[in-house]
């Protein structure tokens, strides 16, 4: 079954609020085998909403509306759909009683326009609103399914989970949708796609969807099957084929992130970390401390932006700063080794480079060195040539730090 989500509200068109409902619904619908092929946003206008309904009826089996169920004159969704389907609006007695009780409890006047929220399409299945006033509803008519939901996410989401999804399962084939996201770092989207292009071209079940975001690449693998275990087997087979080719860049699944994976390995191996940050100015340390319980592995850091701090606090030799420069492999090595010693950690990591927009020390923006000093291991410096804005270069440098830390910890 194919669905279209129609979000109603002028505030969405004006960009005053984000349409988070559509994202939530698309994910939930996909999980029960309903394909969402279109998202539509329309303002609080009867004529344009009617046009949107007519277009959606031509291309979708299910029309899901969010918003426009409230008490004001610009809440037009129910009235417009009722007119389109030649259906009457009738009061739902349970909803009316619930709304009336709310006004009595709060000592407010129960005005006529608030009764409007209890109106539903005649013959519809009514979805109780446990977190608000206006109920939702579902109606199967003329071979189409119409779902009307409130606009506020705090009302819509629990309504969907409790009442709407069980209703929608009556219209699905019983197939389960199983998805797994593979996360990669250190390889561009185009490079990764070339390595798995034949798998993407030949995809049927499961499907493979690449996405690049914040310097990372993900592959979403999605399989359909009536049996969840069989769907997982389909996913696993394709995952194995992918990792045979690009496994060196793989680091995690779904909502696993680089900094969490690195911290997890530090804890597992009982190692402590210290950082020396010039280029990143504390970004790396800030992300480290986003993980709960990190004090057991993170000693601290030094923001060594000025060369005086590099020289007098972290003891980078003056001749290195004068000859090689602060943005150099040698400087990164000294910073990593010396912050490790200074803070008595097992591992020291350093960041030095040019964020831009101008060149520095005759080195172009994006020139970056990440140093990694681990006890009983030779110090390694990773040269990077990054692109992007000043902030993007700094953020990507921190990510590369987590990536190289994670990969090195996997080896030892």
Swiss-Prot record:
Highest taxon listed in the record's lineage: Bacteria
Pfam families reported for this sequence: CinA, CinA_KH, MoCF_biosynth
SMART domains with a match to the protein in the record: MoCF_biosynth
Entry-linked CDD domains: cinA
Family from the record: Belongs to the CinA family.
Name assigned to this protein: Putative competence-damage inducible protein
Native source species: Bacillus cereus (strain AH820)
Recorded name of the encoding gene: cinA
């Amino acid at each position: 079954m194919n669905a279209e989500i129609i979000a109603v509200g002028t505030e969405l068109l004006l960009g005053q609020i984000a349409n988070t409902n559509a994202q939530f619904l698309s994910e939930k619908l996909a999980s029960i085998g309903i394909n969402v092929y279109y998202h539509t946003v329309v303002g609080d206008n009867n004529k344009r909403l009617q046009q949107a309904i007519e277009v959606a009826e031509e291309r979708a089996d299910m029309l899901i509306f969010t918003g426009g169920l409230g008490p004001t004159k610009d809440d037009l969704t129910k009235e417009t759909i009722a007119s389109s389907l030649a259906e009457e609006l009738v009061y739902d007695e349970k909803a009316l009683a619930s709304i009336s009780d709310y006004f009595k409890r709060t000592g407010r006047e129960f005005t006529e326009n608030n009764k409007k929220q209890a109106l539903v399409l005649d013959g519809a299945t009514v979805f109780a609103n446990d977190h608000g006033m206006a109920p939702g509803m579902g109606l199967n008519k003329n071979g189409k399914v119409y779902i009307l939901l409130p606009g506020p996410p705090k009302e819509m989401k629990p309504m969907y989970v409790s009442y709407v999804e069980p209703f929608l399962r009556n219209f699905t084939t019983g197939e389960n949708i199983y998805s797994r996201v593979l996360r990669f770092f250190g390889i561009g989207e185009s490079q990764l796609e070339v390595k798995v292009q034949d798998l993407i071209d030949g995809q049927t079940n499961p499907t493979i969807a690449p996405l690049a975001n914040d310097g990372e690449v993900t592959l979403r693998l999605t399989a359909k099957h009536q049996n969840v275990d069989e769907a997982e087997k389909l996913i696993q087979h394709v995952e194995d084929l992918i990792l045979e080719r690009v496994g060196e860049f793989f680091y995690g699944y779904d909502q696993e992130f680089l900094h969490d994976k690195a911290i997890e390995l530090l804890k597992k191996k009982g190692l402590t970390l210290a950082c020396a940050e010039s280029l990143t100015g504390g970004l790396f340390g800030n992300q480290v401390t986003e993980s709960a319980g990190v004090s057991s592995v993170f000693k601290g850091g030094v923001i060594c932006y000025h060369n005086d701090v590099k020289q007098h606090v972290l003891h980078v030799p003056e001749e290195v700063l004068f000859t090689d420069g602060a943005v150099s492999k040698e400087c990164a090595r000294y910073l990593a080794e010396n912050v490790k010693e200074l803070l008595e950690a097992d591992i020291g990591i350093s960041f030095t480079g040019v964020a831009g927009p101008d060149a520095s020390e005759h080195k172009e923006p994006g020139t970056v060195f990440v140093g990694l000093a681990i006890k009983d291991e030779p110090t390694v410096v990773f040269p990077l040539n990054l692109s992007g804005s000043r902030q993007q270069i700094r953020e990507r440098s921190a990510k590369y730090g987590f990536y190289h830390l994670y990969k090195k910890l996997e080896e030892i």
